[in-house]
Amino acid sequence: MASLFSSRLGSQSLSLLINIFFIFLIFLHFASQTPPPSGSIQTLNSFAGGDSDSCSGGLASLDDHRSKCSYIRSQSKCGPQGYIDYLKIFFCIFGQSPVLGHLVLSAWLFVLFYLLGDTAASYFCPSLDSLSKVLKLSPTMAGVTLLSLGNGAPDLFSSVVSFTRSNNGDFGLNSILGGAFFVSSFVVGTICVLIGSRDVAIDRNSFIRDVVFLLVALCCLGLIIFIGKVTIWVALCYLSIYLLYVGFLSVSHFFDRKKRMSDQILRSREDLAEMGVSLLGYIAEEKLALPEKTTQEFKIVFEDSPKRHRSCFSVLVSIIGLPLYLPRRLTIPVVCEEKWSKPCAVVSTAIAPVLLTELYCSHYSGSQRNLILYIISGSIGLIVGILAYLTTEKSHPPKKFSLVWLLGGFTMSVTWTYMIAQELVSLLISLGNIFGISPSVLGLTVLAWGNSLGDLIANVTVAFHGGNDGAQIALSGCYAGPLFNTVIGLGVPLVISSLAEYPGVYIIPSDNSLLETLGFLMVGLLWALVIMPKKKMRLDKLVGGGLLAIYLCFLSLRLARVFGVLDTDR
């Protein structure tokens, strides 16, 4: 109990630091909104090359922070892609202390990654889990649809934002491919090296199925990138690859289940890996079968802890934590038993329409039109809030219209995930302008690593401690997850972007390094696909060492180009 309490204090300390920093950054945001010095705009435009295509090009030609501050205030191309103007904060507030500015923006990057993961874990995934139960989806179908959507939400929305909001499609392409490469090569390689001496084998059919589907998706994507343009029909065809995967998986699961019933043998959970059952379906079944004892024990530990533990420090943490917790809690309807609160539910239903309107108006300007939308959304929110107050109880979540409540929670959790992803992409683009690094490189590395860190920790832990079943779950996740992100995470933005250009075509951003990334990624997949069967599907150190070498070789090549060590014509 002491360790649990100390870990709780540790998490409270982390929450305290994050929220203090959040408040501090809001102050910096408003402090940076002062007008530029008069009489300097025309001179700076002439000196910095006001007609240059990129903001970083103009900034690179300026020396002192004051001229850079005035320049970014005068150039629309240096405007923020999100809600906070990071370039103004860096050059206008921390211009004389760039090291401090770097630390502040790096810390905020960590906060955004935390918020993105916490929103998905605390609001998005519970909504999906409840929806799967209400819709009575089979474990396999829930696994490859809702569970995959929950796990891939950060990548999906970051990609959508980069294509639609920031007009940096190459950023989204690099982040998705970078994440897929990291998981399928670095994470798989790490797993193989760590458990290579344990003689652990995985199911051949499941492995080949997932890798082949991922290779097919990458080949189609490579063809699209090579052509350089995509129509709405091509984008829909690319998106349908995942539908084929789901259909193939469902048919396979149906015949496996029929075979088990005909044999009339009760299979133990240890035999599931040998039957080729999908990882995602297996995870879903595991979740459904978990005993409630563990959850109850944790509840007992925390609920029965003496109130003397509730010190002034914990109260202070709760108060300062409101800037991060309260906005989401008061706009996302939560209908699970553990977190049910009628006041919060009523307020969230009333405010949610206004937040959706704000998100829409932030994309489309027009004061008169926006005012009308705010009035309409406020009226709708008032009516829905009154209905929620009259039809809910304090003691338990609503039993009637549960699907409506769940859809509302799902919609608002999607909204928050999108908003945070938008801010994350905006910050990375600003960091690219500050350091003079292409945003696509940051998407390939920083964003891909940040979104895939959870996969690294979870899959390595499951494989290391779970024996054969754990290795099967981890390896399948390392291929099924990237397949979802590659097809859905890129297919959805391509459909949205090509639909906006219809009946024309959407032009894929020109970036030759994308084909290079695809090539290395496919080499890693082919290495595993060839070597694993030769090793009788055992997770051998040779497999892991080869995958790690491929990834590190690729990463070294890209970083050498970024820092000017290797200069090649591309």
Curated annotation (Swiss-Prot):
Keyword Protein transport recorded: no
Mode of membrane association: Multi-pass membrane protein
Keywords: Antiport, Ion transport, Membrane, Potassium, Potassium transport, Sodium, Sodium transport, Transmembrane, Transmembrane helix, Transport, Vacuole
Annotated TM spans: 14-34, 97-117, 141-161, 176-196, 212-232, 235-255, 344-364, 371-391, 401-421, 427-447, 479-499, 513-533, 546-566
Subcellular localization, as worded in the UniProt entry: Vacuole membrane
UniProt cross-references to InterPro entries, sorted A to Z: CaCA_antiporter, NaCa_Exmemb, NCX_ion-bd_dom_sf
Chief location of this protein within or outside the cell: membrane
Tissue specificity: Expressed in roots, leaves, stems and flowers.
Annotated Gene Ontology cellular component terms: vacuolar membrane
Induction context: By salt stress and drought stress.
One record GO biological process: sodium ion transport
Gene3D superfamilies on file: NCX, central ion-binding region
One Gene Ontology term of the molecular function aspect: antiporter activity
Disulfide bonds: none
Similarity field: Belongs to the Ca(2+):cation antiporter (CaCA) (TC 2.A.19) family. Cation/calcium exchanger (CCX) subfamily.
Role description: Vacuolar membrane-localized H(+)-dependent K(+) and Na(+) transporter.
Protein name: Cation/calcium exchanger 1
Protein source organism: Arabidopsis thaliana (Mouse-ear cress)
Taxonomic path: Eukaryota, Viridiplantae, Streptophyta, Embryophyta, Tracheophyta
